[in-house]
Curated annotation (Swiss-Prot):
Positions marked as site (Transition state stabilizer): 327
Residue positions binding Mg(2+): 194, 196-197
Known catalytic reactions: 2 (2R)-3-phosphoglycerate + 2 H(+) = D-ribulose 1,5-bisphosphate + CO2 + H2O; D-ribulose 1,5-bisphosphate + O2 = 2-phosphoglycolate + (2R)-3-phosphoglycerate + 2 H(+)
Main localization (coarse): plastid
Enzyme class (EC, first level): lyase
Annotated gene: rbcL
Native species: Gladiolus gueinzii (Coastal gladiolus)
Cell compartments where the protein resides: Plastid, Chloroplast
Function: RuBisCO catalyzes two reactions: the carboxylation of D-ribulose 1,5-bisphosphate, the primary event in carbon dioxide fixation, as well as the oxidative fragmentation of the pentose substrate in the photorespiration process. Both reactions occur simultaneously and in competition at the same active site.
Protein name: Ribulose bisphosphate carboxylase large chain
Protein backbone atom coordinates (compact mmCIF):
# COMPACT_ATOMS: atom_id res chain seq x y z
CA UNK A 1 0.00 0.00 0.00
CA UNK A 2 2.82 2.37 0.93
CA UNK A 3 4.20 2.25 -2.59
CA UNK A 4 0.87 3.54 -3.92
CA UNK A 5 0.56 6.41 -1.45
CA UNK A 6 4.21 7.45 -1.37
CA UNK A 7 6.24 7.23 -4.54
CA UNK A 8 9.82 8.22 -3.79
CA UNK A 9 12.00 10.04 -6.29
CA UNK A 10 12.13 13.19 -8.38
CA UNK A 11 9.02 14.23 -10.28
CA UNK A 12 8.15 17.04 -12.67
CA UNK A 13 7.07 20.22 -10.91
CA UNK A 14 4.44 20.94 -13.54
CA UNK A 15 2.39 17.92 -12.49
CA UNK A 16 1.69 19.62 -9.16
CA UNK A 17 2.43 23.32 -9.52
CA UNK A 18 1.27 24.27 -13.03
CA UNK A 19 -2.49 24.82 -12.76
CA UNK A 20 -3.81 26.89 -15.69
CA UNK A 21 -7.41 26.30 -14.60
CA UNK A 22 -6.84 27.94 -11.19
CA UNK A 23 -9.07 30.93 -10.35
CA UNK A 24 -7.08 33.42 -8.27
CA UNK A 25 -8.53 34.46 -4.91
CA UNK A 26 -8.81 38.01 -3.59
CA UNK A 27 -6.55 36.99 -0.72
CA UNK A 28 -3.75 35.54 -2.88
CA UNK A 29 -0.46 37.35 -3.31
CA UNK A 30 0.13 37.37 -7.07
CA UNK A 31 3.57 37.59 -8.66
CA UNK A 32 4.67 38.15 -12.25
CA UNK A 33 8.07 36.60 -13.00
CA UNK A 34 10.10 37.04 -16.16
CA UNK A 35 11.48 33.53 -16.67
CA UNK A 36 14.37 32.58 -18.98
CA UNK A 37 14.54 28.76 -18.89
CA UNK A 38 17.70 26.80 -19.67
CA UNK A 39 17.72 25.28 -23.18
CA UNK A 40 15.46 22.24 -23.31
CA UNK A 41 13.39 23.17 -20.25
CA UNK A 42 9.72 23.75 -21.19
CA UNK A 43 8.17 27.06 -20.10
CA UNK A 44 5.49 25.27 -18.03
CA UNK A 45 8.14 23.33 -16.10
CA UNK A 46 10.17 26.50 -15.47
CA UNK A 47 7.10 28.43 -14.28
CA UNK A 48 5.99 25.55 -12.07
CA UNK A 49 9.51 25.26 -10.65
CA UNK A 50 9.38 28.92 -9.62
CA UNK A 51 6.00 28.41 -7.92
CA UNK A 52 7.25 25.29 -6.14
CA UNK A 53 10.61 26.56 -4.95
CA UNK A 54 9.15 29.82 -3.65
CA UNK A 55 6.38 28.05 -1.71
CA UNK A 56 6.07 24.45 -0.47
CA UNK A 57 8.18 22.46 -2.92
CA UNK A 58 11.49 20.72 -2.55
CA UNK A 59 13.49 18.80 -5.14
CA UNK A 60 12.17 15.36 -4.25
CA UNK A 61 9.06 13.78 -2.78
CA UNK A 62 9.21 13.66 1.03
CA UNK A 63 7.24 11.62 3.58
CA UNK A 64 6.09 14.70 5.46
CA UNK A 65 4.15 15.93 2.41
CA UNK A 66 1.50 13.51 3.65
CA UNK A 67 1.13 15.44 6.91
CA UNK A 68 0.07 18.68 5.25
CA UNK A 69 -2.63 19.87 2.91
CA UNK A 70 -0.53 20.66 -0.14
CA UNK A 71 -3.48 22.03 -2.07
CA UNK A 72 -4.03 24.64 0.59
CA UNK A 73 -0.43 25.79 0.90
CA UNK A 74 1.23 25.43 -2.48
CA UNK A 75 2.07 28.28 -4.83
CA UNK A 76 0.52 27.84 -8.26
CA UNK A 77 1.74 28.93 -11.67
CA UNK A 78 -1.66 29.79 -13.17
CA UNK A 79 -0.71 31.50 -16.44
CA UNK A 80 2.28 31.73 -18.77
CA UNK A 81 2.73 34.05 -21.72
CA UNK A 82 5.63 34.64 -24.08
CA UNK A 83 7.41 37.95 -23.41
CA UNK A 84 6.83 40.18 -26.43
CA UNK A 85 9.96 40.95 -28.42
CA UNK A 86 12.19 38.62 -26.38
CA UNK A 87 13.38 35.19 -27.41
CA UNK A 88 13.01 32.36 -24.89
CA UNK A 89 11.53 34.64 -22.22
CA UNK A 90 8.18 34.08 -20.58
CA UNK A 91 6.05 35.89 -18.03
CA UNK A 92 4.95 33.33 -15.44
CA UNK A 93 2.13 34.35 -13.10
CA UNK A 94 2.21 32.71 -9.69
CA UNK A 95 -0.45 32.82 -6.96
CA UNK A 96 0.57 32.31 -3.32
CA UNK A 97 -1.95 31.52 -0.58
CA UNK A 98 -1.91 34.16 2.14
CA UNK A 99 -1.20 31.58 4.85
CA UNK A 100 2.39 31.28 3.63
CA UNK A 101 3.30 34.74 4.93
CA UNK A 102 3.80 36.31 8.34
CA UNK A 103 1.60 39.34 8.93
CA UNK A 104 3.30 42.73 8.81
CA UNK A 105 6.68 41.37 7.67
CA UNK A 106 8.13 42.49 4.34
CA UNK A 107 11.21 40.49 5.33
CA UNK A 108 9.24 37.25 5.44
CA UNK A 109 7.39 38.05 2.21
CA UNK A 110 10.65 38.48 0.31
CA UNK A 111 12.33 35.50 1.96
CA UNK A 112 9.46 33.36 0.70
CA UNK A 113 8.97 34.78 -2.77
CA UNK A 114 12.54 35.58 -3.83
CA UNK A 115 14.62 33.91 -1.13
CA UNK A 116 15.79 30.73 -2.81
CA UNK A 117 14.45 30.39 -6.29
CA UNK A 118 16.83 32.75 -8.12
CA UNK A 119 19.72 30.29 -8.02
CA UNK A 120 17.64 27.52 -9.53
CA UNK A 121 19.43 25.29 -12.06
CA UNK A 122 16.54 24.94 -14.52
CA UNK A 123 16.48 28.72 -15.01
CA UNK A 124 19.02 30.75 -16.90
CA UNK A 125 17.62 33.96 -15.39
CA UNK A 126 14.63 35.10 -13.35
CA UNK A 127 13.19 38.53 -12.63
CA UNK A 128 10.31 39.46 -10.35
CA UNK A 129 8.45 42.13 -12.34
CA UNK A 130 5.47 42.91 -10.10
CA UNK A 131 3.49 41.81 -7.05
CA UNK A 132 -0.20 42.19 -6.26
CA UNK A 133 -0.58 42.71 -2.53
CA UNK A 134 -4.07 41.70 -1.41
CA UNK A 135 -6.04 43.96 0.91
CA UNK A 136 -6.03 41.26 3.58
CA UNK A 137 -2.22 41.40 3.68
CA UNK A 138 -1.60 45.14 3.19
CA UNK A 139 -3.89 45.86 6.16
CA UNK A 140 -1.39 44.06 8.43
CA UNK A 141 1.17 46.81 7.68
CA UNK A 142 1.30 50.30 9.14
CA UNK A 143 2.81 51.69 5.93
CA UNK A 144 4.35 55.18 5.74
CA UNK A 145 4.69 56.94 9.10
CA UNK A 146 2.64 59.94 7.92
CA UNK A 147 1.97 60.14 4.19
CA UNK A 148 1.71 62.99 1.73
CA UNK A 149 -1.18 65.00 3.18
CA UNK A 150 0.04 64.89 6.77
CA UNK A 151 3.51 65.93 5.63
CA UNK A 152 2.11 68.96 3.79
CA UNK A 153 0.17 69.92 6.91
CA UNK A 154 3.25 69.53 9.12
CA UNK A 155 5.36 71.66 6.77
CA UNK A 156 2.57 74.08 5.79
CA UNK A 157 3.58 73.81 2.12
CA UNK A 158 0.91 73.31 -0.54
CA UNK A 159 0.39 73.44 -4.29
CA UNK A 160 3.96 72.82 -5.42
CA UNK A 161 6.70 70.19 -5.36
CA UNK A 162 9.13 70.40 -2.43
CA UNK A 163 12.79 71.29 -3.01
CA UNK A 164 15.80 69.49 -1.59
CA UNK A 165 19.57 69.38 -1.91
CA UNK A 166 22.12 66.73 -1.01
CA UNK A 167 25.09 68.30 0.76
CA UNK A 168 28.31 67.78 -1.21
CA UNK A 169 31.14 66.85 -1.03
CA UNK A 170 29.40 63.95 0.56
CA UNK A 171 32.42 62.78 2.54
CA UNK A 172 35.12 64.82 4.24
CA UNK A 173 33.39 67.95 5.58
CA UNK A 174 33.58 68.69 9.29
CA UNK A 175 30.27 68.90 11.15
CA UNK A 176 30.54 72.69 11.52
CA UNK A 177 31.15 73.28 7.80
CA UNK A 178 28.46 70.77 6.93
CA UNK A 179 25.96 72.67 9.09
CA UNK A 180 27.00 75.90 7.39
CA UNK A 181 26.20 74.47 3.95
CA UNK A 182 22.82 73.27 5.27
CA UNK A 183 22.01 76.74 6.58
CA UNK A 184 22.95 78.47 3.32
CA UNK A 185 20.77 76.16 1.22
CA UNK A 186 17.74 76.41 3.52
CA UNK A 187 18.16 80.17 3.89
CA UNK A 188 18.22 80.52 0.11
CA UNK A 189 14.79 78.94 -0.28
CA UNK A 190 15.00 75.14 -0.23
CA UNK A 191 12.60 73.15 1.94
CA UNK A 192 15.05 70.36 2.76
CA UNK A 193 18.70 69.47 2.70
CA UNK A 194 19.92 65.90 2.84
CA UNK A 195 22.65 63.74 4.27
CA UNK A 196 24.19 61.64 1.54
CA UNK A 197 23.30 57.96 1.80
CA UNK A 198 26.84 57.03 2.89
CA UNK A 199 27.12 59.73 5.54
CA UNK A 200 26.60 57.72 8.74
CA UNK A 201 29.14 58.28 11.51
CA UNK A 202 32.67 58.36 10.14
CA UNK A 203 35.92 59.53 11.78
CA UNK A 204 35.84 62.95 10.07
CA UNK A 205 32.27 63.66 11.25
CA UNK A 206 30.54 61.73 14.01
CA UNK A 207 26.76 61.55 13.82
CA UNK A 208 26.03 63.46 17.02
CA UNK A 209 28.08 66.50 15.98
CA UNK A 210 26.40 66.55 12.58
CA UNK A 211 22.92 66.31 14.12
CA UNK A 212 23.62 69.22 16.48
CA UNK A 213 25.05 71.56 13.83
CA UNK A 214 22.32 70.70 11.32
CA UNK A 215 19.61 71.37 13.92
CA UNK A 216 21.19 74.77 14.59
CA UNK A 217 21.17 75.49 10.85
CA UNK A 218 17.50 74.49 10.57
CA UNK A 219 16.36 76.73 13.43
CA UNK A 220 18.40 79.70 12.17
CA UNK A 221 17.01 79.34 8.63
CA UNK A 222 13.45 78.94 9.95
CA UNK A 223 13.75 82.09 12.04
CA UNK A 224 14.99 84.11 9.07
CA UNK A 225 12.61 82.84 6.39
CA UNK A 226 9.42 82.19 8.36
CA UNK A 227 9.15 78.80 6.64
CA UNK A 228 9.42 75.32 8.12
CA UNK A 229 12.70 73.68 7.14
CA UNK A 230 14.16 70.20 7.44
CA UNK A 231 17.37 68.24 6.98
CA UNK A 232 17.26 64.49 6.38
CA UNK A 233 19.41 63.27 9.25
CA UNK A 234 20.65 59.83 8.23
CA UNK A 235 19.99 57.46 11.13
CA UNK A 236 21.29 54.38 9.27
CA UNK A 237 23.75 52.51 11.48
CA UNK A 238 25.48 49.18 11.99
CA UNK A 239 22.91 47.89 14.48
CA UNK A 240 19.20 48.54 14.98
CA UNK A 241 19.87 49.75 18.52
CA UNK A 242 22.32 52.38 17.28
CA UNK A 243 19.87 53.45 14.56
CA UNK A 244 17.11 53.95 17.13
CA UNK A 245 19.48 55.90 19.37
CA UNK A 246 20.15 58.31 16.50
CA UNK A 247 16.46 58.66 15.68
CA UNK A 248 15.69 59.36 19.35
CA UNK A 249 18.35 62.07 19.46
CA UNK A 250 16.87 63.68 16.34
CA UNK A 251 13.50 63.72 18.06
CA UNK A 252 15.04 65.38 21.14
CA UNK A 253 16.49 68.09 18.90
CA UNK A 254 12.97 68.75 17.61
CA UNK A 255 13.82 68.35 13.92
CA UNK A 256 11.04 67.24 11.55
CA UNK A 257 12.64 64.41 9.55
CA UNK A 258 15.16 61.56 9.64
CA UNK A 259 16.48 59.30 6.92
CA UNK A 260 17.23 55.63 6.31
CA UNK A 261 18.94 53.54 3.61
CA UNK A 262 16.30 50.84 3.44
CA UNK A 263 17.99 48.23 1.27
CA UNK A 264 21.41 48.25 2.91
CA UNK A 265 19.80 48.70 6.33
CA UNK A 266 17.27 45.94 5.67
CA UNK A 267 13.48 45.76 5.85
CA UNK A 268 13.37 44.68 9.49
CA UNK A 269 15.34 47.76 10.55
CA UNK A 270 13.30 49.97 8.22
CA UNK A 271 9.93 48.83 9.57
CA UNK A 272 11.18 49.30 13.15
CA UNK A 273 12.26 52.85 12.36
CA UNK A 274 9.00 53.62 10.51
CA UNK A 275 6.96 52.57 13.56
CA UNK A 276 9.11 54.79 15.78
CA UNK A 277 8.69 57.72 13.38
CA UNK A 278 4.91 57.49 13.43
CA UNK A 279 4.82 57.22 17.21
CA UNK A 280 7.12 60.22 17.61
CA UNK A 281 6.00 62.56 14.84
CA UNK A 282 9.12 62.26 12.67
CA UNK A 283 8.91 62.17 8.89
CA UNK A 284 11.02 59.44 7.27
CA UNK A 285 13.06 59.95 4.10
CA UNK A 286 14.14 56.75 2.37
CA UNK A 287 17.17 56.34 0.14
CA UNK A 288 17.41 53.34 -2.16
CA UNK A 289 21.19 52.77 -2.09
CA UNK A 290 21.98 49.31 -3.56
CA UNK A 291 18.82 49.17 -5.68
CA UNK A 292 20.68 48.87 -8.99
CA UNK A 293 22.40 45.71 -7.76
CA UNK A 294 18.92 44.18 -7.64
CA UNK A 295 16.97 45.96 -10.37
CA UNK A 296 19.36 46.93 -13.16
CA UNK A 297 19.47 43.69 -15.18
CA UNK A 298 16.49 43.49 -17.50
CA UNK A 299 16.16 39.71 -17.22
CA UNK A 300 17.30 38.94 -13.66
CA UNK A 301 16.64 40.31 -10.18
CA UNK A 302 13.64 42.44 -9.22
CA UNK A 303 12.10 45.48 -10.86
CA UNK A 304 12.21 48.62 -8.74
CA UNK A 305 8.41 48.78 -8.69
CA UNK A 306 8.49 45.70 -6.42
CA UNK A 307 11.01 47.36 -4.10
CA UNK A 308 8.84 50.50 -4.13
CA UNK A 309 5.69 48.56 -3.16
CA UNK A 310 7.64 46.83 -0.41
CA UNK A 311 8.83 50.18 0.90
CA UNK A 312 5.29 51.56 1.01
CA UNK A 313 4.32 48.58 3.16
CA UNK A 314 7.42 48.74 5.37
CA UNK A 315 7.16 52.50 5.79
CA UNK A 316 8.70 55.71 4.45
CA UNK A 317 7.41 59.19 3.58
CA UNK A 318 9.84 59.93 0.72
CA UNK A 319 11.68 57.56 -1.59
CA UNK A 320 14.12 58.16 -4.43
CA UNK A 321 12.52 57.18 -7.71
CA UNK A 322 14.81 58.26 -10.54
CA UNK A 323 14.43 61.43 -12.58
CA UNK A 324 13.39 60.61 -16.18
CA UNK A 325 15.89 63.41 -16.96
CA UNK A 326 19.39 64.06 -15.59
CA UNK A 327 22.23 61.61 -14.97
CA UNK A 328 20.16 58.63 -13.74
CA UNK A 329 17.66 58.41 -16.53
CA UNK A 330 14.72 56.05 -16.15
CA UNK A 331 12.21 55.10 -18.81
CA UNK A 332 9.44 57.66 -18.50
CA UNK A 333 6.33 55.48 -18.58
CA UNK A 334 7.84 52.80 -16.34
CA UNK A 335 9.00 55.42 -13.84
CA UNK A 336 5.59 57.09 -13.76
CA UNK A 337 4.04 53.65 -13.29
CA UNK A 338 5.80 53.02 -10.00
CA UNK A 339 5.52 56.69 -8.98
CA UNK A 340 1.73 56.21 -9.12
CA UNK A 341 2.09 52.95 -7.16
CA UNK A 342 3.80 54.99 -4.44
CA UNK A 343 1.38 57.93 -4.35
CA UNK A 344 -2.07 56.77 -5.36
CA UNK A 345 -4.68 54.74 -3.53
CA UNK A 346 -5.86 52.66 -6.47
CA UNK A 347 -3.76 51.83 -9.54
CA UNK A 348 -5.19 50.06 -12.58
CA UNK A 349 -3.34 47.30 -14.39
CA UNK A 350 -1.51 48.86 -17.35
CA UNK A 351 1.14 46.80 -19.10
CA UNK A 352 2.41 49.77 -21.12
CA UNK A 353 3.56 51.28 -17.80
CA UNK A 354 4.86 47.98 -16.47
CA UNK A 355 1.95 47.51 -14.08
CA UNK A 356 0.99 43.82 -14.23
CA UNK A 357 -1.77 43.89 -11.59
CA UNK A 358 -4.42 46.28 -10.36
CA UNK A 359 -3.34 47.37 -6.88
CA UNK A 360 -5.73 48.70 -4.23
CA UNK A 361 -3.89 50.17 -1.23
CA UNK A 362 -7.14 50.70 0.75
CA UNK A 363 -6.17 54.09 2.20
CA UNK A 364 -2.59 53.23 3.13
CA UNK A 365 -0.75 56.60 3.19
CA UNK A 366 1.20 57.54 0.06
CA UNK A 367 4.93 58.11 -0.39
CA UNK A 368 6.43 61.21 -2.04
CA UNK A 369 8.70 60.26 -4.95
CA UNK A 370 12.07 62.02 -4.91
CA UNK A 371 13.68 63.02 -8.21
CA UNK A 372 17.40 63.28 -7.67
CA UNK A 373 20.59 62.88 -9.67
CA UNK A 374 22.23 65.24 -12.16
CA UNK A 375 19.33 67.66 -12.47
CA UNK A 376 19.55 71.47 -12.66
CA UNK A 377 17.38 74.56 -13.29
CA UNK A 378 16.85 73.86 -17.00
CA UNK A 379 15.19 70.56 -16.05
CA UNK A 380 12.68 72.27 -13.74
CA UNK A 381 9.80 72.61 -16.27
CA UNK A 382 10.08 68.95 -17.30
CA UNK A 383 10.29 67.77 -13.68
CA UNK A 384 7.30 69.87 -12.63
CA UNK A 385 5.28 68.51 -15.53
CA UNK A 386 6.32 64.86 -15.13
CA UNK A 387 6.13 64.51 -11.34
CA UNK A 388 3.42 67.04 -10.51
CA UNK A 389 2.97 68.68 -7.11
CA UNK A 390 3.37 65.60 -4.95
CA UNK A 391 7.10 65.12 -5.30
CA UNK A 392 10.46 66.25 -3.94
CA UNK A 393 12.94 67.63 -6.47
CA UNK A 394 16.51 67.33 -5.27
CA UNK A 395 19.37 69.34 -6.72
CA UNK A 396 22.73 68.52 -5.13
CA UNK A 397 25.34 69.77 -7.56
CA UNK A 398 22.54 71.81 -9.14
CA UNK A 399 22.48 73.93 -5.97
CA UNK A 400 26.03 73.75 -4.61
CA UNK A 401 27.60 74.12 -8.06
CA UNK A 402 26.27 77.66 -8.46
CA UNK A 403 29.12 80.07 -9.29
CA UNK A 404 28.06 82.53 -6.57
CA UNK A 405 27.73 80.00 -3.76
CA UNK A 406 25.21 77.78 -2.03
CA UNK A 407 22.53 80.31 -1.05
CA UNK A 408 22.25 81.84 -4.56
CA UNK A 409 22.11 78.27 -5.91
CA UNK A 410 19.14 77.61 -3.66
CA UNK A 411 17.52 80.91 -4.71
CA UNK A 412 17.90 79.95 -8.38
CA UNK A 413 16.13 76.63 -7.84
CA UNK A 414 13.30 78.18 -5.83
CA UNK A 415 12.74 80.94 -8.39
CA UNK A 416 12.75 78.41 -11.24
CA UNK A 417 10.24 76.22 -9.41
CA UNK A 418 7.90 79.09 -8.52
CA UNK A 419 8.05 80.31 -12.14
CA UNK A 420 7.16 76.85 -13.46
CA UNK A 421 4.30 76.35 -11.00
CA UNK A 422 2.88 79.80 -11.77
CA UNK A 423 3.16 79.22 -15.53
CA UNK A 424 1.44 75.86 -15.21
CA UNK A 425 -1.35 77.35 -13.11
CA UNK A 426 -1.85 80.00 -15.80
CA UNK A 427 -2.39 77.23 -18.31
CA UNK A 428 0.94 77.32 -20.13
CA UNK A 429 2.46 74.14 -21.56
CA UNK A 430 5.61 73.33 -19.58
CA UNK A 431 6.78 70.67 -22.02
CA UNK A 432 6.73 73.08 -24.96
CA UNK A 433 7.44 76.46 -23.35
CA UNK A 434 9.75 75.32 -20.54
CA UNK A 435 12.94 77.01 -21.69
CA UNK A 436 11.10 80.24 -22.40
CA UNK A 437 9.52 80.25 -18.92
CA UNK A 438 12.95 79.84 -17.31
CA UNK A 439 14.46 82.57 -19.52
CA UNK A 440 11.68 85.00 -18.55
CA UNK A 441 12.29 84.30 -14.87
CA UNK A 442 16.00 85.08 -15.37
CA UNK A 443 15.06 88.70 -16.08
CA UNK A 444 14.11 89.30 -12.46
CA UNK A 445 16.50 86.88 -10.76
CA UNK A 446 20.21 87.41 -11.40
CA UNK A 447 20.96 84.27 -9.36
CA UNK A 448 18.84 82.17 -11.70
CA UNK A 449 20.42 83.83 -14.74
CA UNK A 450 23.88 82.86 -13.47
CA UNK A 451 22.75 79.26 -12.91
CA UNK A 452 21.23 79.10 -16.40
CA UNK A 453 24.52 80.30 -17.86
CA UNK A 454 26.55 77.57 -16.10
CA UNK A 455 24.34 74.63 -17.08
CA UNK A 456 23.03 75.79 -20.44
CA UNK A 457 24.97 73.16 -22.41
CA UNK A 458 24.02 70.13 -20.30
Amino acid sequence: IASVVFKAGVKDYRLTYYTPEYETKDTDILAAFRVTPQPGVPAEEAGAAVAAESSTGTWTTVWTDGLTNLDRYKGRCYHIEAXVGEENQYIAYVAYPLDLFEEGSVTNMFTSIVGNVFGFKALRALRLEDLRIPTAYSKTFQGPPHGIQVERDKLNKYGRPLLGCTIKPKLGLSAKNYGRAVYECLRGGLDFTKDDENVNSQPFMRWRDRFVFCAEAIYKAQAETGEIKGHYLNATAGTCEEMMKRAAFARELGVPIVMHDYLTGGFTANTTLAHYCRDNGLLLHIHRAMHAVIDRQKNHGMHFRVLAKALRMSGGDHIHAGTVVGKLEGEREMTLGFVDLLRDDYIEKDRSRGIFFTQDWVSMPGVLPVASGGIHVWHMPALTEIFGDDSVLQFGGGTLGHPWGNAPGAVANRVALEACVQARNEGRDLAREGNEIIREACNWSPGLAAACEVWKEI
